[in-house]
Amino acid sequence: MSIWKSFQNGIIDRGRNMKRTLIVATTSYAGMGPYVSEIVNTFSPEDDVYFFFHDYEDDFFKRNIKKELHKKSVFFKQANSAINKLKELLLNSEGYDSLILDVCREFQIQMVHYINGLPSIKMQRCLEQNGINILSTVHDLSPHEAKKVWYKQFRQIVSYKRMKENLLAANLLVTNSQNQYEELSRRFPEKKVYFHDFPSLVTSEIANGTKIPVELNHINKPYILFFGRIEEYKGIRLLFTAFCKSQELNNNYNLVIAGNGQLNIDTQKANSNVLFINRYIHDEEIAYMYKHAACVVYPYISATQSGVLSLAFYFKTPTLTSNVSFFRKIIEESQGGLMFENGDVDDLTEKIIALLHMDVSKMKQNQADYYRLNYNPQAIKNTLMDIYNNRK
């Protein structure tokens, strides 16, 4: 039996102007899993949209994509292993391109939306030769600051080089960053560039989670939270330094740095008021961390687009961010947090203390209002359907 029988004859009649679309998700790594699932779950079985998911060992997509869409989905399981990463690096292929082409032919797909990034030039050419349009979501046009072991750094360099090459070949692009939208439009006036809002990262598993991270059982003071994958560009060392230099913060609070990744901090020299939860944080643990935090800090050195504020705003956690343009736009519009001068340790310390001493009731209301109005899944779906059907 063909693998495509998983679609279970989910073909539906198309309107005259409808373009049958296949959304391809190539990774659930880091925040990409919730990003994809929250967008995909806005669709219904009645929409002329199909789905191809590359799942890892944890079956993230199979667990988080709503059941009613499974009959129109293919879940291709391939381990996120070192050998598979090496193959992808050497061959410049995801390893399932032929399967995507098969489903496009069998179900007469007219547009493929690569929701995690740009497909290879070879894959773009193959799809175009079959009369299929390609829409690619551009996430990070330029690489962020990074401090990685040599082979990961090399992989990042190669990946961005290929991304630039793939970008030159692409015709239809979409991004979730207004600044990036403007830059893409300026650099590539011959291409069609679209924008839609970044989705909320609050999945049902996150919203309904009740699990307490075991490490927090030993916390005996209110805590300041950083949560996210550990990356150099997120400014974690800046936050660590700002906290450690303040006697007031050390006397009254703990700093919790939670997330998987390479810390690049000498944890042996950290004082007892700093707790590193340096592991993968399960979705069921996130609600507790945010609900019980005195505040959350996002000290990013750079940020193109991010969904982290959706977590803070959903749980109404007092928020402090750097004033990089992406955060500044949301904080100024929502009044849902405070900002500090990017890279300024002293200002970061002062703003943390100010946030912890202020009445945050209005801030929390602003967060709730902004979340309700701006993390609107129906609006994202409507925008994408317009793009798919050439109405924008």
Positions of PLM-derived features:
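Membrane-proximal helix-turn-helix segments that form the acceptor-binding/catalytic region
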Residues: 101-102, 122, 153-173
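Conserved donor-binding/catalytic core segment of Leloir-type glycosyltransferases
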Residues: 215-234, 240-244, 255
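Nucleotide-activated donor-binding/catalytic signature segment of Leloir-type glycosyltransferases, i.e.
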Residues: 265-288
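Acidic donor-binding loop of glycosyltransferase active sites
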Residues: 288-304, 314-317
